[in-house]
Amino acid sequence: MNSPASFVKSLLAQCCLGGICEWVVCPGARNMALLQVLAAAEDLVKWTHFDERSAAFFALGRIQDIGLPVAVVTTSGTAAAELLPAVVEAYYQRRPLLLLTADRPAACRGSAAPQAIEQADLFGIYAPTIDLETPESLPEDILQDWDYASPLHINVCLPDPDPAWNPGSCDLYPAEPPEENGFRGSLAELARALRFKSRGGLVVMIGGLDPTEQAPARWLANELKAPVVADATSGLREELAHLALTDADALLREHPPAVLLRLGDVPVARFWRDLEDIPATEVFSVTRTGFSGLARPSSVVTGDLEAILHALGDIDTVGDVNGLRAMNKRRKALMEELLITCPESEQAMVRSFSCFAADGDCIYLGNSMPVRYWNSFAQTSIPTENVRANRGTNGIDGQISGFLGVSARCSRSWALVGDLTAMYDSNALALLPQLDRGTRVLGVINNGGGGIFRTLPGADGQPETMRKLLVQPHAHSFKAIAEQWGMRYLTIRTAEDFDQLDSLEENSQTLVELIPDREQTEQIRLRLANAQV
């Protein structure tokens, strides 16, 4: 058997020199040579998981946490295909996720030989492939053309594994990846809009931000003093509460601003989608991803937020030209009243959960409903800067994996996901023993199925057979899942049950099942939907 010793060692050394600082490794036979070198490289940070799909989302979480490139390593066949959901998410987040997939020799392609699929260009536009059919095809610097702004796929054809091969000493260390410089887009157009066009009203919408983006975004919002809609994942939702509009989609539809300035990722608020039908509002985005987030014309400036704002120069105060914050006070008061009168609703449970989670150093929000509820109902008294989510392209896929990746080095971390989300990704909890010791709380809102689908227009009028297909109702408890993975289990049905969270043990892993009252949840939804703007 042929062991591709120098080839594999050289490939992994180049990846390390290109800045790959952590490795998420999945088991297999075809990738054994890669695993043997990684096992011998004692100075590299390595994680392992049997589920490639989950492993890729865990790697994405690690990238979110450390801001550096991470690789996921798989064997051949559908093991490589399992990476696709996380690859798509990483593409739209512009994260440096490296996919290193082992492949059978190129002669097997198109043959339907066991565990042989067409792996070159497997991920389409989402991750270009560098296809290494032979050792001679390895370039001198395999990552030299990678921009680190989206995933990259290295597909390496390997002979049959040799379990007896000893790679010897493997002194591999990660180097610093290159820094991104400059920005793209028209600053002059943005500057004119802020200075002149904003006299007709300006609203600042802040999507997800990386930690280095929070200070410049905070500074700009405080300078402009315009109404702000800040997602929890911006890390600024609480700090900018004095400027904020709360649950203001209807208000903004009735009183659209002349100019909307978006900072960071695409916002979650419904009004962002409504902008498709409001051409009179000029939209300007300042974002590291470069995506407009809209199907209509808008202006996008792409790059480092701090560098862009520095280039803009002095910023004039705009203020709340249209008096939106004053008009929003009535809705804020109604929301607070409803949380008191419906304490067992999903909305009130999210508020209570957020009060406890605020003492953590990491919060993770999974799937649509927890994200939207958190943005509207979570506490605003205590700043929570480190809030993460994979919200862009997937709903329930890989959310627990992402949480564990983000929180792997945290001392106190909290997550809130839906019930279908938790069931879909529960095997990610097999990663728990590898993580740093710390207090982790996984909150699961169990509303008996896909609760968000019950709120879709016309859902109430659907026949029961259709509702089953749409909502996926169930009567499962999460106690067995907690026990399977060695987690403490708590159930919360009432406001008083939250007192249990006062007695969490240090370095404990706890699954908290929140079981809300459906009638109270629906009461809040209908009151807010029918309330005057």
Curated annotation (Swiss-Prot):
The reaction(s) this protein catalyses: isochorismate + 2-oxoglutarate + H(+) = 5-enolpyruvoyl-6-hydroxy-2-succinyl-cyclohex-3-ene-1-carboxylate + CO2
Cofactor remark from the record: Binds 1 thiamine pyrophosphate per subunit.
GO molecular function annotations of the record: 2-succinyl-5-enolpyruvyl-6-hydroxy-3-cyclohexene-1-carboxylic-acid synthase activity; magnesium ion binding; manganese ion binding; thiamine pyrophosphate binding
Membrane-spanning intervals of the chain: none
Keywords recorded for this protein, A-Z: Magnesium, Manganese, Menaquinone biosynthesis, Metal-binding, Thiamine pyrophosphate, Transferase
Cofactor(s) needed by this chain: Mg(2+); Mn(2+); thiamine diphosphate
GO biological process, one term: menaquinone biosynthetic process
Keyword Nucleotide-binding: no
Its EC number(s): 2.2.1.9
Pfam families: TPP_enzyme_N
Annotated InterPro entries: MenaQ_synth_MenD, THDP-binding, Thiamin_PyroP_enz_TPP-bd_dom
Annotated pathway: Quinol/quinone metabolism; 1,4-dihydroxy-2-naphthoate biosynthesis; 1,4-dihydroxy-2-naphthoate from chorismate: step 2/7; Quinol/quinone metabolism; menaquinone biosynthesis
Protein's UniProt keywords contain Transferase: yes
HAMAP family reported for this sequence: MenD
Role description: Catalyzes the thiamine diphosphate-dependent decarboxylation of 2-oxoglutarate and the subsequent addition of the resulting succinic semialdehyde-thiamine pyrophosphate anion to isochorismate to yield 2-succinyl-5-enolpyruvyl-6-hydroxy-3-cyclohexene-1-carboxylate (SEPHCHC).
Family (UniProt): Belongs to the TPP enzyme family. MenD subfamily.
Subunit structure, interactors included: Homodimer.
PANTHER family per the UniProt record, alphabetical: 2-SUCCINYL-5-ENOLPYRUVYL-6-HYDROXY-3-CYCLOHEXENE-1-CARBOXYLATE SYNTHASE (PTHR42916), PROTEIN PHYLLO, CHLOROPLASTIC (PTHR42916:SF1)
Protein name per its UniProtKB record: 2-succinyl-5-enolpyruvyl-6-hydroxy-3-cyclohexene-1-carboxylate synthase
